[in-house]
């Protein structure tokens, strides 16, 4: 009989340590150190590629299929509305507060404890690989994308993100566009019929009324959101251009390239996609992992948020403790019980799948 209490307590202790360490994307080397030390102290062999920590179960057998357990240890920067110290892990009323506690620290430490549980077991029907990755929040080049090609063939991946331990069997893709609206620079006192700020206002209105025809049963509509605007340097000068950032969440009825081509037809500006590779992803509703989840009464849904699933070509699900609505919010937290139950549910699901 394994000691579930030790797995749970170790997970909470590790999460507290990770919260106390600043780990913004591209600067997560110290949290990588902490995860590496956690595994080594338990006599678990691991490798490091940049700030990614990789470990294989002790009796890894290349003739068996392999399950990847992945989550990330980088965070966004704390927003200005924090009332608590984002780097001081504080427990109050069953909640563990701190930056990255919910996204995706809770899922990460729960998956690590799940991996520890299976690590020394012989005669498993599947191999397990643990990947604690960096650069997820910024879709960086040295995160999971750089590691996957170096791993053995992955047959199934579980990506740990806050999903309330419901299983995301599909997730929307993402395109971030830089829009440049050109105009004519002039003194504010003079007539100017080509003010790019006015043109940008009209363009934003057009964007707000764009509706893509194809709706997904799992992922709903394509969603377009202007998230940034930048123009001008002083009050009496009309700028020569305005820069917008457009965030587009793409359902499984369109490829990112199709969305790009459609927007070029209707937006009268320069439109530059930062990346067209982060397409929507999904797994068959008849896949064994989905059927096992349903047998164990897990709920399934389509996720509007992007994760490292977009960078994994094999079948995958997104699953983890915590609530996506708390991600990137001030005074971020996760319930202790969410982590405790998350570890139990991960283990139960993988045991059912491995029968």
Name the predicted role of every residue range.
Residues 16, 36, 109-112, 116, ...:
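Predominant activation on well-ordered alpha-helical scaffold segments within soluble catalytic domains
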Residues 67-69, 131, 156-158, 317-319:
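Hydrophobic/aromatic beta-strand patches that form the interior of the parallel beta-sheet core
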Residues 73, 136, 162, 188, ...:
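Active-site metal-binding loops of divalent metal-dependent hydrolases
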Residues 104-176, 180, 216:
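Acidic/histidine-rich catalytic neighborhood of metal-dependent amide-processing enzymes
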